[in-house]
């Protein structure tokens, strides 16, 4: 059942933490709370979220992503966890299976950011896709599982004065959502400045 928007430009965000151990209560999930905190700081336009905590099972991941986009009506879905080379890491495969358009630039940029910190970032297989239905479309992106890495990939790298050195991936998300017919997203510029061409900017 689709969620009711309280405002025409309210962004519906799906947050999915994918972990065998967290989903069975072995340890507490950190990915979704980190994302909730980040969006609370970063977005100035209205938004609401739908969260899920599921195991590393490809069919379950696919069903969850489809539910969030097709049934709930999310405009943006972010996953955390399950993107490494281990046998149980199947989040990218599930994401690609439900997508209608691959968006490789997001994964490429995430790895470029993370490689500034750890050489093992090259082992990460994060992907992003657009999922389209006859009357709706959404951007689905895989993120790292650690809160620090989540923030770094979304915001990018800044120098001591706060000037951007390497853009974070979220800078491109608002315009991407524009292009697929979603709500107009506005951000707190000192956290993450949204980039749009001048022709796509709304008058203040």
Residue locations for each model-derived region?
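Non-catalytic beta/alpha edge segments that cap or flank active sites
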Residues: 1-204
